[in-house]
Structure formats: structure tokens, C-alpha cells
Amino acid sequence: MMPERLRRMHYIGGMSSPPASSPRLSMSRVLWCGAAIVTLSMGIRHGFGLWLAPITMDRGWTRETFSFAMAVQNLAWGLAGPLTGMLADRWGAFRVLAAGSGLYALGLLLMALSTTGLAFTGSAGLLIGIAQSGTTYAVVYGVIGRHVDPARRSWAMGVAAAAGSFGQFLMVPVENWLIASFGWQQALMLLGALALLITPIALGLREPARAATSSQAHQSVLSAVREAFGERSFQLLMAGYFVCGFQVVFIGVHMPSYLKDHGLAPEVATGALALIGLFNVVGTYTAGSLGQRFPKRYLLSGIYLLRSLAIVIFLNVPLTPMSVYVFAAVMGVLWLSTVPPTNAVVAQVFGVQHLSMLGGFVFLSHQVGSFLGVWLGGRLYDSTGSYDIVWWIAVALGVLAFAVNLPIRETPLVRAPAGALAAR
């Protein structure tokens, strides 16, 4: 086995980008289409917490029933991510995005029609989770990695993440208005029609045949997986991303009900979720830009530590609309700001040939955290009548994520030719 000091070398000769002869999409086309897709996909899902109260009241379900479906959704998203990423790396992003768009629409329709907890888990959980794996960051970032130069890659990923954040800001008040105007069932059906728009937009990300497979000297899928999971930095990156998922999905799904339990108007929760999306536009763009200039591990550690600090302050000040809005703004800056530097580290260290798949594995860890955050929130609320324990778990995990990101190494791997390895 080649020593670590020989495998880790400075980036030389563009190993992380497609060869110059490979057909490439223009950066503006990739960013506009990718941003529009992420805006729709992430915008729709960000408002799911608004459905908790009307669905559970109308169906007579507990919060744990709704929370479990959302937990399954996040877990299914994560589990399907490596597979959809592998398909996108092999066959190009368009086919995966089109399939994800149709599945998203079907899941929203069946979510509206589900009358049992099992059916709701299958539609809102399993179907929509798989759909999200094919319409969000892993697939879009794979296209960015293959068609944007390394010198601007982190920035471009920040732009795409900022678009997803804008979708959250845009769609939350829209979804709240749809529920108030048409009822929760019809609102879900209208969102299903909106999800179908992803397919025509995805035509702009249809990649030339060679671009999807010629990133560098060919490496098999199994070899790429073994290499990544054998790297300590990849393991630490996954551990930190687990915490990200736990924190943001717990807050996104349960904060509206937390605020309602404390006597605040529903409009406060809607405003808070919208503010998270608005300020996350700034946060994700800034994180992508800073990741181009500073060590990404320090950026990630700082984000996780600041999240824990923000939660501690929020829990220890009087709960008023103003304190909620300030907390939402601060958390918004930190919300998905982990996404660009995390994916940029994967691309920087392992190259872009299997970027969607490896990004999918990292995101799987995120979604396991999401599963636990959203489910545990409902479970502990039903058993204790309070979210307090889960809030403090989120604080402790943030401190842990701060620590595990510090030793991550960002130096690209350079793979020696097979003949050179055999001679050692």
C-alpha cells in the first residue's frame, strides 16, 4: 500500500476537473438551471413543518406519526443518495432529475390522499425522500463539479446552495397561503404540479456523453467507495454532517409547533421559516466564497460552534416574536452554509468522477441525523410534553461537530498508475 505521504500531494495538472477536450456546459447555464431546480425542490420541502398541525388535527394522528414520516423521508433521501448519485455520474443528470421530478409530484399527490399512518409514511416519507435524492444537491453539484473549473467550484456550489435558500424564503409564505386558501390537501396537489416543472428545467443540464464519464483516469465505483471510506477525513466529514442534519431538520419541522405551544401566532412561525431561508441565501453564498479562500475545515467548525451558541442564547432569553426572528436570522446564516464547503472538500480530495455518488454518501450521514432529529423531536415531545431535551441534544452535537471537523485534511489524493503501485 502506498504511504500516506506519497498518496497526498499538492494539486497538479487539473486532476479534479474534466480534460479540456471534454465537451462542457457553460457555467452560466449550469448555475441558472441548477439554481432553479434546487429552488423548487428545496423550497417545497422546507415548508413541510407547516402541515404538521393541520394534518394531525384533521386525521387525528399524534405528532410522532407525522414526525416518523418526515424522519423516513430524510432517511430515504439519504439512503437513495449514493445510488442516484452513481446513476447521475454514469448516465448524466437529466435522466435522474426527470425521474425525481415525477416521483416528487406523485409523492405529494399521495401524501394528500393518505388516510392511514402507514400510507402517509409511504408517500410523504419513502416516495418524496427518494424523489429528493434525485432533485437536490448531490445531482446538481455533480454537474457543477464536472463543468466548473476548480478555481471557482466552491463559489459555484455556494451559488446553488443560495438558490435553495431563496426557494425556502420564497416557498414558505406561498405554502402557508395555499393551505389557508385551498386547504392542506389541495395545497399539496398544487405543489405536486409545481414539482413537475423540474423536468423541463433539467433539459438545461443534459450533459454531453463524454462529460459524464471522463473526469480523470477511470476509477471503478467500488474502488472509489473503498478509497473514500478508508480516508479518516471522509469519516470525520460524515460525522459532522450527521450533526448538521439533526439540527436543521429538527428545527425546520418542530419549531412551528414549539412556538405554537408557547402561545405565539402561526404567522410568527411562518415568518421565522421564511427568515431562515432569506438569511441562508447570504450564508450559503458567503460560505461558498470563503471556502474558495480559507481552509474549509475551519469554516465548518466555526459554523457548528456558532449554531450551538445561537441555540443556547435562544433557550435562555424570553420567547417573543422578536427573539424568534433574531434567532431565525442567525440560524439562517448558518443553516445550509455547511453544504458548499462540505461538497467542495469531497471534490477537492477525491476528484469529480464520482462526485455525485460520494456526495450522496456524505449526505446519507446528514440524513441519518435528520431522521433522528425529526423523529426524536416528536417522540420526546409525546412522552415528556416538551422539546427541551432535544434542543440541548442539538447543542451538544454542535460542539462535537466543531471538534471533529478541525483535523480534516483537504489535500487532494493523487493516484499512482497501477504499474507504479505494483513495482512497490
Please tell me what each predicted stretch does.
Residues 276-280, 286, 293-345:
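C-terminal transmembrane helical hairpin of 12-TM major facilitator-type secondary transporters
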Residues 39, 107, 119-135, 242, ...:
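Hydrophobic core of transmembrane alpha-helices in multi-pass small-molecule transporters
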Residues 48-52, 231-285:
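Extracytoplasmic gate region of multi-pass secondary transporters
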Residues 79-118:
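Conserved MFS/SLC helix-loop-helix module at the cytosolic interface between two early adjacent transmembrane helices
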Residues 80-92, 284-295, 382:
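Helix-to-loop junctions at the C-terminal end of transmembrane segments
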Residues 46, 74-82, 168-169, 277-285, ...:
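Residue-level signature of mid-helix packing/kink "hotspots" within the transmembrane helices
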Residues 124-162, 351:
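Cytoplasmic helix-loop-helix junction between adjacent transmembrane helices
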Residues 160-210:
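Helix-loop-helix hairpin linking two adjacent transmembrane segments in secondary transporters
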